[in-house]
């Protein structure tokens, strides 16, 4: 075969392959159209394709026309049901670590807020850490003087549990130097107290929008729990104090629906003092263990019913759980009266387990260092000293601080009971350490049906920071 014949043969073969390829494509298109039409899903160039992307604060709907995109924003659908929260507390044999934010360690080189009073609260889908910022960052000049409790720069913010209180993930909640927050199953409600000491105001936000307010009724530093409020069947409850920190003050229970106050009642507690209650739901009622900042080293107990009737007294146990306090052996316990004659105090918590009680306390009797949780047999109803369980959370070589309670709802756990959980604040900086600032991180623990070994989950930041050396 001469060269011309070879060229003709190759060209003919190529042309044949090309024609076959075209035929196959035509057949493919015909088959596709027939199949789509038979299935009722034939596409029209004038039709639309809608894709929805669920984001944190909105649903983004993208409508794709032929050669055109139209983007519109539609309201994110809210949860349909209120949480029940009438289940009993689960029995806890020990407490397992749930989260640790390490905020101060990260903040030595990261954009982390200076905070105090962190606490945790949960919705049906997530738990969040709330905290009161000082309007400044760690290792920055504006952190100077942040040992002060109340200032116009303080705000309530939140992050998903386990995240550090950093600039990039924090969500603004309220202007506040005292606060509480909880979720009713549909939306978050926050109560943020701010303003001058003699005319402070509490703003109730629901779904991020101001809905109601509470003005100071005693003109002496209106304040609230610094931990989670409690929602039962859509009604949310919290406790507030107005008046002196070192003598008789005035105390009120508030009840709100969808962020609007629908009830309140004064607590009659002559001779007793209530501040910074740590509350949780249990069998349809709200149970609180509070702080007596006047005289008692035993903790006030408050049990609230849905009609705002209440019982108030002191944790009966013959072991004191406030700080400062005396020796355990010298304490007798009382269900009705403050004992110990030690002023000041620290926010704390406990959980009723039948007639027993789990109670948290600092290991030190005189300072906010170390932390342990102990189980006292019949400690809810009797002056019992029978300590049947002890778990160390922070050893006594490291700083602790406030502590408080919350529960995991059944929507999260799929259990038939509410899991008891607590957090412990670890305060660093002033007044105990040589820094220009005061801030804290936290460790969070949740009840399990197994014993858990003691350990020290302390803060671990190495101080002072660079800003403290200038």
UniProtKB/Swiss-Prot annotation:
Catalyzes the removal of terminal sialic acid residues from viral and cellular glycoconjugates. Cleaves off the terminal sialic acids on the glycosylated HA during virus budding to facilitate virus release. Additionally helps virus spread through the circulation by further removing sialic acids from the cell surface. These cleavages prevent self-aggregation and ensure the efficient spread of the progeny virus from cell to cell. Otherwise, infection would be limited to one round of replication. Ca(2+) binds at residues 292, 296, 322. N-glycosylated. Residues 89-470 are annotated as: Head of neuraminidase. Keywords: Calcium, Disulfide bond, Glycoprotein, Glycosidase, Host cell membrane, Host membrane, Hydrolase, Membrane, Metal-binding, Signal-anchor, Transmembrane, Transmembrane helix, Virion. It is an enzyme of class 3 (hydrolase). Homotetramer. Substrate binds at residues 116, 150, 275-276, 291, 368. Inhibited by the neuraminidase inhibitors zanamivir (Relenza) and oseltamivir (Tamiflu). These drugs interfere with the release of progeny virus from infected cells and are effective against all influenza strains. Resistance to neuraminidase inhibitors is quite rare. This is Neuraminidase. Belongs to the glycosyl hydrolase 34 family. Its cofactor is Ca(2+). Residues 1-14 are intravirion. GO terms for cellular component: host cell plasma membrane; membrane; virion membrane.
């Amino acid at each position: 075969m001469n060269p011309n014949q070879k060229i003709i043969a190759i060209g003919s073969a190529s042309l044949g392959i090309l024609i076959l390829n075209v035929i196959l494509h035509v057949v493919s298109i015909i088959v596709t159209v027939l199949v789509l039409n038979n299935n009722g899903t034939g596409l029209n160039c004038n039709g639309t394709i809608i894709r929805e992307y669920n984001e944190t604060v909105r649903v983004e709907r993208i409508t794709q026309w032929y050669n055109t995109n139209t983007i519109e924003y539609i309201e994110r659908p809210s949860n349909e049901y209120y949480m029940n929260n009438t289940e009993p507390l689960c029995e806890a044999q020990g407490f397992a670590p749930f989260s640790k934010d390490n905020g101060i360690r990260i903040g030595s080189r990261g954009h982390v807020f200076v905070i105090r009073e962190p606490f945790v609260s949960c919705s049906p889908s997530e738990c969040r850490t709330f905290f009161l910022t000082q309007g400044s960052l760690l290792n920055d000049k504006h952190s100077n003087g942040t040992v002060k409790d109340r200032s116009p720069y303080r705000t309530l913010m939140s992050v998903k549990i386990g995240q550090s209180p950093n600039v990039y993930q924090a969500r603004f909640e309220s202007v506040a130097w005292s606060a509480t927050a909880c979720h009713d199953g549909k939306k978050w409600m926050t109560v943020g107290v701010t303003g001058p000491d003699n005319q402070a105001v509490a703003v109730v936000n629901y779904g991020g929008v101001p809905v109601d307010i509470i003005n100071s009724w005693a003109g002496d530093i209106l304040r609230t729990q610094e931990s989670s409020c409690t929602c039962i069947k859509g009604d949310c409850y919290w406790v507030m104090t107005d008046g002196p920190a070192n003598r008789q003050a005035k105390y009120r229970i508030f009840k709100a629906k969808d962020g609007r106050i629908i009830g309140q009642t004064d607590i009659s507690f002559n001779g007793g003092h209530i501040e910074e209650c740590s509350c949780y739901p249990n069998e349809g009622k709200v149970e609180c263990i509070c702080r007596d900042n006047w005289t008692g080293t035993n903790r006030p107990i408050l049990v609230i019913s849905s009609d705002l009737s209440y019982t108030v007294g002191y944790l009966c146990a013959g072991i004191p759980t406030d700080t400062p306090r005396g020796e355990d052996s010298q304490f007798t316990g009382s269900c009705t009266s403050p004992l110990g004659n030690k002023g000041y105090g620290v926010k704390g918590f406990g959980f009723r387990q039948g007639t027993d009680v789990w109670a948290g306390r600092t290991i030190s009797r005189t300072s906010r260092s170390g932390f342990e949780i102990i189980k006292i047999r019949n400690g809810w109803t009797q002056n019992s000293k029978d300590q049947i369980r002890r778990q160390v959370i922070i050893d006594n070589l490291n700083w602790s601080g406030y502590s408080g309670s919350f529960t995991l709802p059944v929507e999260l756990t799929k259990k038939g009971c509410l899991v008891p959980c607590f957090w412990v604040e670890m305060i660093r900086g002033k007044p105990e350490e040589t820094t220009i600032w005061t801030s804290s991180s936290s460790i969070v623990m949740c009840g399990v049906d197994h014993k858990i070994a003691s350990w020290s989950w302390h803060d671990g930041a190495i101080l002072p920071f660079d800003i403290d050396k200038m």
